[in-house]
Swiss-Prot record:
GO molecular function, one term: transcription cis-regulatory region binding
Regions that span the bilayer: none
GO CC annotation: nucleus
Function: Transcription factor involved in the expression of defense genes in innate immune response of plants. Interacts specifically with the W box (5'-(T)TGAC[CT]-3'), a frequently occurring elicitor-responsive cis-acting element. Activates WRKY 29, SIRK and its own promoters.
Domain of life: Eukaryota
Gene giving rise to this polypeptide: WRKY22
Subcellular localization: Nucleus
Keyword rRNA processing: no
Gene induction: Induced after flagellin treatment.
Record protein name field: WRKY transcription factor 22
């Protein structure tokens, strides 16, 4: 025993104690597979760890969802940015469309300038134009006493041909005719049948005058016949009015017999009339005939 208490023995004892301690600590883990007591504890530890894991998983899912929601939040304000882009595209497209419109206007102006034609025509040659025109407006010109007339082609509705006619200031016998655009149809063959022609106006005036002349002729003939018929009756009544104005003879109201007229003829044949009475050449045949007609009508 004394030999065992040297330095080497102490070192050996310490190493043995440490090895034994390690073996004792590790041994329950090895024997836990066979010992049911330790197995129950391991199962309870496993169950508790699973429960803790189950309790922890919702928080992890919520954290994941919240992380995704945080990622989605900046995406929402991006939507109006996407909506603004079509507006910019529409604005850019509008600018693009506006460019050809300006080019079209410039082209149309160029076309008008190219198709414009100015001619100096005498007053006598204005009616010799091959095309048919209709006047649709008139406008005064500054510094000129003569107005300017505007004409369009009357042959076709879709024709864009126009004409401007104005009298020359320096030479009033000359006219300045400006043609714009071109005709899209052939020249008309019959000018009399065109709308807006002034050749038919005299015929219309003649037709308008003819009813008045016929009415005048019809109205004049009955008046003259009535005058010729009425005037002799007035003369005869004035001659037969011997007693006064109250005893006028009315053939329509009285019935006269034939003996009365025979007595009148004998009375007219004698010389019993004075100087103020009717002459001997007075003929009562007209009165007799008229009285006969009235009696026959009654």
């Amino acid at each position: 025993m004394a030999d065992d208490w040297d330095l080497h023995a102490v070192v050996r004892g310490c190493s043995a104690v440490s090895s034994s301690a390690t073996t004792t600590v590790y041994s329950p883990g090895v024997s836990s597979h066979t010992n049911p007591i330790f197995t129950v504890g391991r199962q309870s530890n496993a169950v508790s760890f699973g429960e803790i894991r189950d309790l922890y998983t919702p928080f992890t899912q919520e954290s994941v969802v919240s992380s995704f929601s945080c990622i989605n939040y900046p995406e929402e304000p991006r939507k109006p940015q996407n909506q603004k882009r079509p507006l910019s595209l529409s604005a850019s497209s509008g600018s693009v469309t506006s460019k050809p419109s300006g080019s079209n206007t410039s082209r149309s102006k160029r076309r008008k300038i190219q198709h414009k034609k100015v001619c100096h025509v005498a007053a006598e040659a204005l009616n010799s134009d091959v095309w048919a025109w209709r006047k649709y407006g008139q406008k005064p010109i500054k510094g000129s006493p003569y107005p300017r007339g505007y004409y369009r082609c009357s042959t076709s509705k879709g024709c864009l041909a126009r004409k401007q006619v104005e009298r020359n200031r320096s030479d009033p016998k000359m006219f300045i005719v400006t043609y714009t655009a071109e005709h899209n149809h052939p020249a008309p063959t019959h000018r009399n049948s065109l709308a807006g022609s002034t050749r038919q106006k005299p015929s219309d005036q003649q037709t308008s005058k003819s009813p008045t002349t016929t009415i005048a002729t019809y109205s004049s003939s009955p008046v003259t016949s009535a005058d010729e018929f009425v005037l002799p009756v007035e003369d005869h009544l004035a001659v037969g009015d011997l007693d006064g104005e109250e005893d006028l003879l009315s053939l329509s109201d009285t019935v006269v017999s034939d003996d009365f007229f025979d007595g009148l003829e004998e009375f007219a044949a004698g010389d019993s009339f004075s100087g103020n009475s009717a002459p001997a050449s007075f003929d009562l045949s007209w009165v007799v005939n008229s009285a006969a007609t009235t009696t026959g009508g009654i």
